[in-house]
């Protein structure tokens, strides 16, 4: 469900006040251009992208990271992708199945996928229904360290009547079938090549993961660990050849260095741009800064099974003691949509009736008193011999996070709560559960990062009792049976209008239970060379449409 929406994901991305639509600014530049009208620093048809995240792996079955989702959109095999307006479009299928076109049965329990003919993997092997069936079984194989299996357990039977048809039989209808069943939006798996992986007991340590073979406009050429990943056009892509001849994803952990390289024009594209750098990058000559509303949201997760925050009154108190307006003004340069539901206001599933929690230290103190946490001589509250001090995990090299944590620490001290900060490399912080990943392994008390909101507003993968890692991304380990019931009703309905009341119920419970505190809804910021053309990122899969991107 969530890769970038799914998604899964550092708070180095920026949060912003949502304008009515996207905005962009470009600094004027007086410079000579080549015969093609390009700046002298532009390398024709070669895009250089910068990411502050180190890369934990390239197989989206096993890794949840923004940059991996971007590369996967360009290289991997998806049944469905998304257009500029976040609408699903067929990729390896000839049509997106619906009840209206007969692709989904009247009872909602049968989904038929009609596959394209004549498609080849980037290594030349033919693609057919065998790959989809194999990939389905791969997701269902408990030996594989899948990032998410949300919805896959509903599949009771798979039919392959011919080499270009796959039929899923489900225990019950499933609204999130498009993004979750090999769709490019979210922390979802792609279709894998059976001919390369079928003989392995699991995919966890397969050599394939280092340079995956896929079906996209580009293919992997090299991965230099902690340095860069290079993509080149896939000559076998069924839609033809992209305009770009080379894409290099440069790993640059320090954002000051990224900004410098944007100024010296050693890179052409940077996203997500942190709020602290927005004014700087949009002032760089020859650079466009595109700003548009996001589906991503920044959040503070509480380890709900930790004795210090197992009581929802404590979590409510901690939320009251977060001065989000202060954080936005001091760290986010005034950019951020303050709200208390994880669903973006740009998503049709957004509930506008959820109230906004104010900054209120008096109410925070009162709630902690009610919960039985008393101040000690050092000012820190305690109960039953346990102090209210939390390990606060964050990613190394993210100064915005460090500033946010220190501002939070100052306010929490006023309510008798202490913080101990633990820094981790991004690759370890977001590593798979079985590889000792900090986030999914629950090796923290409190953590701030970001998630991508689901395309249809499905929250099961984040908050269901059955979605604890490694079976989902419910890393707060929150469990409310009433929420599970509402999410089950939501997922059983294909009609947006019919399922909305159930999503509203879920959002109301999350507001009251506070498994995590919503910090703000983000905006997506893209800083790029003004020579870049054809780049029109959407909210859910910004790199899905790259055929006509050029520089």
What does each model-found stretch correspond to?
Residues 112, 206-209, 234-280, 397, ...:
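Ligand-site clamp/hinge motif
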Residues 21-24, 139-140, 157-159, 221-235, ...:
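Extracellular/periplasmic solute-recognition and catalytic clefts
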Residues 29-30, 224, 228, 233, ...:
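Detector for C-terminal structural segments
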Residues 50-104, 137, 211-215:
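N-terminal lobe/hinge region of extracytoplasmic solute-binding protein
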Residues 96-145, 167, 261, 308:
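Aromatic- and charge-enriched surface segment that lines or borders ligand/interaction sites
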Residues 48, 128-135, 163-169, 173, ...:
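Alpha-helical secondary-structure segments
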Residues 42, 149-198:
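Surface-exposed binding/hinge segments that line
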Residues 83-87, 185-242, 246, 256, ...:
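Gly/Pro-rich hinge or "lid" segments in bacterial periplasmic/extracellular proteins
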